Amino acid sequence: MKKILIVMSAAAGLAFVGCRPQNPDAPAVREFIRDNWHTTVQHCTADTATLIGLPYPYTVPTAGAMFREMYYWDTFFTNEGLVRDGHPELAKGNTDNLLYMVRRFGKVYNGSRTYYEARSQTPYLSMMVDRIYRLTGDKQWLADAYQTLKEEYGFWMRERLTPTGLNRYGSSASDALVDEFLVTGGKRLG
């Protein structure tokens, strides 16, 4: 891979030096994230309008009123940060909520809103399950999660399989679901 990057960089007239760019604000940003996880936690157990109730507290993409729902692949990256910063219980709750969605709907929606029903995102749930199992060592939890992961896999093989035999994420939204999404999106934009 390094050879490929060197050749591509040379072809583009760039010098490959094998280092990561340093942002002078990075430590402050990192500290802000670490100190503010608690501001991204929501807990809504009952379905309310378009919001899907989830059994465990969960994290949303940002603090404030803009988001009350969790998002599938955002949660993978969030969980990595939560574990790194000493919040494995929140990462497990996030993962348990996604497993709950599979048990309830047969798949994980793009986000925990009804208008995301027809949209899928990259399936990171098995990696989240692996991460939580490695933290907890809970074999019964893993066995239960494995059964649920098989159900999610079935969705990908039925609904998101291409003629090449590969899977892809996408949308099969009806006009009604698109309209529902536009109403909420419009409210967010003011």
Task: Tell me what each language-model feature is.
Residues 1-22:
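Bacterial Sec-dependent N-terminal signal peptides
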